[in-house]
Regions:
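N-terminal signal peptide c-region/cleavage motif recognized by signal peptidases
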Residues: 22-23
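Domain-level marker for long, solvent-exposed, non-transmembrane regions
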Residues: 26-164
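Residues at the start of alpha-helices and the adjacent loop-to-helix junctions
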Residues: 14-19, 60-61
């Protein structure tokens, strides 16, 4: 009887550990919560945007800010409070992300190509605690012309020459 209880408890412990390992493995797959807005004028061929990532931890990898900046320029678009202008998403809409999911999975993986199109302006991150979450902000320059050319050459979006 005692041997059966030990085996039963052992199986329960193994099952619980397996569940926690699986949950931990998918923690990085969670969609990012972020906001993006225009921050001013960048050099020709770039957008200057302020990205705010909303998460439970106060520490953030700089690459996550860059990823959100490129993702926001591609699929969300942004508006500027100062110039009262709106930039449409470079890729057109979120449907493009779903249609070309294989391409964007590789593009946005850790250390993926997206990193070539975003540069942090300054070294500092602004961290503000609001309730149980942190809002971590930074200004990022996104190379929109180079990003556009990359997507056209990959066949993700149609270039201007194809429309006429």
């Amino acid at each position: 009887m005692r041997v059966m209880n030990v085996k039963f408890v052992g199986r329960i412990i193994m099952t619980v550990l397996f569940v926690f390992i699986c949950i931990g493995a998918h923690a990085d797959d969670a969609p990012l919560k972020y906001e993006i807005e225009g921050e001013g004028v960048g050099v020709q061929g770039t957008y200057l945007v302020k990205v705010t990532v909303i998460q439970k931890k106060s520490k953030l990898d700089v690459d996550v800010i860059k990823k959100c900046a490129v993702h926001g320029v591609l699929f969300k678009g942004f508006s500027s409070q100062t110039s009262r202008t709106r930039q449409k998403p470079l890729a057109g809409s979120m449907v493009v992300e779903q249609q070309h999911q294989d391409y964007f999975d590789v593009f946005f993986q850790k250390g993926g190509s997206y990193i070539n199109f975003a540069n942090m302006i300054g070294e500092n991150l602004s961290v503000v605690k609001m309730g149980k979450q942190y809002r971590i902000s930074a200004v990022v320059s996104v190379a929109k012309d180079a990003l556009y050319q990359e997507l056209v050459s990959a066949g993700v979006i149609k270039g201007l020459n194809n429309g006429f």
